[in-house]
Amino acid sequence: MADQNDVDYEHLEYVDYKDTEFLEQFINNQGKILPRRVTGVPARVQRQITKAIKRARHLALMPYVSESVR
C-alpha cells in the first residue's frame, strides 16, 4: 500500500510505466491492482497508475501474477 507522504499525488503529472518500483506500491501480494479507496490517490492519478501497470505488464516489465500465486 502506498504511503501518502511519499509523493504529492495532486501535482503528479505523469506516471511512468517503466518505473516498476513505484508501480509495485499499488499492487497487492496476488498481483492485483489496489483500489483507490485503499491507496488514497485522486481518481485522475489512479487512472494513470492503472494504465501504467497494464502497459508494464504488456511489455513484460511486471508480472501479471505474483510469484506466490504461480
UniProtKB/Swiss-Prot annotation:
Keyword rRNA-binding: yes
Lineage top rank: taxon: Bacteria
GO molecular function annotations of the record: small ribosomal subunit rRNA binding; structural constituent of ribosome
InterPro entries referenced in this protein's UniProt entry, alphabetically: Ribosomal_bS18 (IPR001648), Ribosomal_bS18_CS (IPR018275), Ribosomal_bS18_sf (IPR036870)
Pfam name, any one: Ribosomal_S18
Gene Ontology biological process terms, A to Z: translation
Protein function: Binds as a heterodimer with protein bS6 to the central domain of the 16S rRNA, where it helps stabilize the platform of the 30S subunit.
Protein's recorded name: Small ribosomal subunit protein bS18
Organism from which the protein derives: Salinibacter ruber (strain DSM 13855 / M31)
